[in-house]
Amino acid sequence: MSKLITCIWFAGNNGEEAAQYYIDTFNSAPDDHSAKIGDQTKAPKASEEVSGRPEGSVLTAECELDGISFMLLNGGPMEQFKLNGGTSFIIECETQEEIDYFWEKLSAVPEAEQCGWCTDKYGVTWQVVPRILDEIMRLS
């Protein structure tokens, strides 16, 4: 059986750091959230020129956040892979406490972001929303 995995390109070569940050954030969250670290791959000599990562350093770090698999790639600074708000990850929250927690952890500029959308210190965009938002939208 095939498996869908989201790969996020980190131009700043900080994918390993981001993976650990997300693991810590989700595992410390109130209510029912979970995260775990997965495998890492090391950079081969051939990737050194593109990524700027020395041979043997971490090229990819895998993690699972609330059951969803991610591969965080230390790909190097390539403009066509720059992160933007066109892709976001939705975190459905049961309580205001959860919303406030994720907003505080994942919003790099809280006063500049609104309507549940925030961008973290790594450039990844998140939507932190109440779990019942879809139902509310359908009923309006």
Q: Model features per residue range: what roles?
A:
Residues 25, 64-69, 74-76, 80-125, ...:
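Vicinal oxygen chelate
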Residues 46, 134-140:
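A short, polar/charged loop-to-alpha-helix boundary motif
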